Amino acid sequence: MSSKNKIIQELENEQLKQELPEFSPGDTVVVQVKVTEGNRERLQAYEGVVIGIRNRGLNSAFTVRKISHGVGVERTFQTHSKQVESITVKRRGDVRQAKLYYLRELTGKAARIKEKLN
């Protein structure tokens, strides 16, 4: 590793959030997002099922899917972004795959995820 890469790595490590909860695909999470409307800022809660996680250090991201008024809505969040205020795990899901893209095709009761019991 060159010295330039080490410097970049150190700078990225400083910006990583330390107090993140452990969550995995299939979990139902509530993400508090900072929303700026005009000159005021407020928090908006976005609740849904995590359908994918991308672990890339500072560039880590996760995708949350929810059904809003009968329409599926997916939103991708940068894990270490300043816009993401907090992440709360509401329910642990029991799934066997890392990416739950198949949920896009399912509707109603078929799209439910079993709860992890432990």
UniProtKB/Swiss-Prot annotation:
This is Large ribosomal subunit protein bL19. One of its GO terms (biological process) is translation. The keyword Ribosomal protein applies. It comes from the Bacteria. InterPro entries: Ribosomal_bL19, Ribosomal_bL19_CS, Ribosomal_bL19_sf, Translation_prot_SH3-like_sf. HAMAP family: Ribosomal_bL19. Keywords: Ribonucleoprotein, Ribosomal protein. Belongs to the bacterial ribosomal protein bL19 family. This protein is located at the 30S-50S ribosomal subunit interface and may play a role in the structure and function of the aminoacyl-tRNA binding site. It holds the Pfam family Ribosomal_L19. GO terms for cellular component: cytosolic large ribosomal subunit. PANTHER family: LARGE RIBOSOMAL SUBUNIT PROTEIN BL19M (PTHR15680:SF9), RIBOSOMAL PROTEIN L19 (PTHR15680). One of its GO terms (molecular function) is structural constituent of ribosome.
